[in-house]
Amino acid sequence: MILDAYRSCGWRHRGFDTGYGKVVNRWNWVRTFDGIKDERTLLASYKPRTRWSVNRARTSGVRVRELGADELGTFVDIERKTAGRRGFMARDEDYYRRFKETFGSRARFMLAEIHADELLAGLTAEHDRLADRLDSLRTRYEAHATTRLKRQIDDTARNLTALERRLDEARALTTHGSVIPAACALFVEHRRETVYLTAGALPEYRAYQAPALLVHEGMLRLCVNSTQPRRFNMYGITGVFNDPDDEGRGVLEFKQGFDGHAEELAGAFILPTSTIRYKLSEAAHTIKLLKEAGR
């Protein structure tokens, strides 16, 4: 019905394609929150890997805050580095300043930072606690050896070894600063939905799972805890769901981890203002496709 209405007005549909759209996304990933009342039920709705990522970020000293208008340079720097790595076009700081001026408080520029000193202090305290526990278990084992105590000693020793590796990483991290920007995201609030418009992350801090916590906090603050019921539009996916080698596979799996569903839109339309020019453009496009197919 929609297609017929547009066609009756002279518009031409560009087709039911897949991939990332240049004019408009034809495929989006959308999350609604029926039955979600608080953070506990929100986390429970995620896939196990995503839930682990959110919890890992929090226990790794990652904190999310909103950027002020005078801090947009940090956002732009992270997005620019991400764009260079992934091959999409980054906007400059002036663009985002104008964006903020236009949308005002509805444009939420969020930053995930690693609080390295806080992380190091927490891991050190946990290390001391485990070391004391291991000493206590060994003392009890020497006094009265049991299989149960031996198992507890082995488990605690393994946990202590893993924690020592994290401590070494945290000590190295503090050389980059006490608070380190790791990822950013722009959420835009509308009456019925919040849009996860664009984001960026620094690969050297991938292990800290900052992007997962950013999305979680966006959903929690701007949808679940909002007085205005909203859905969460995670925006573009390619629309290819059964090809593990598709260019958008990683993005799809990341978004799927937060639950939700794919939403297929009608796509792009054009209105020819010159029949001759339109036919020439279509012919050139067809020739290009044939050449690409023949390679």
What are these regions (language model features)?
Residues 8-207, 225:
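A conserved beta-strand-loop-helix scaffold within acyl/acetyltransferase catalytic domains
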Residues 1-4:
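Hydrophobic or amphipathic alpha-helical targeting/insertion segments
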Residues 200-210, 239-246:
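Short, contiguous acidic/charged loop-to-helix segments that flank catalytic cores in large enzymes
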Residues 9-37, 229-295:
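Active-site/acyl-donor-binding loops of N-acyltransferases
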Residues 206-220:
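Conserved acetyl-CoA-binding loop-helix of GNAT-fold acetyltransferases
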Residues 222-228:
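Secondary-structure transition/capping motifs at alpha-helix termini
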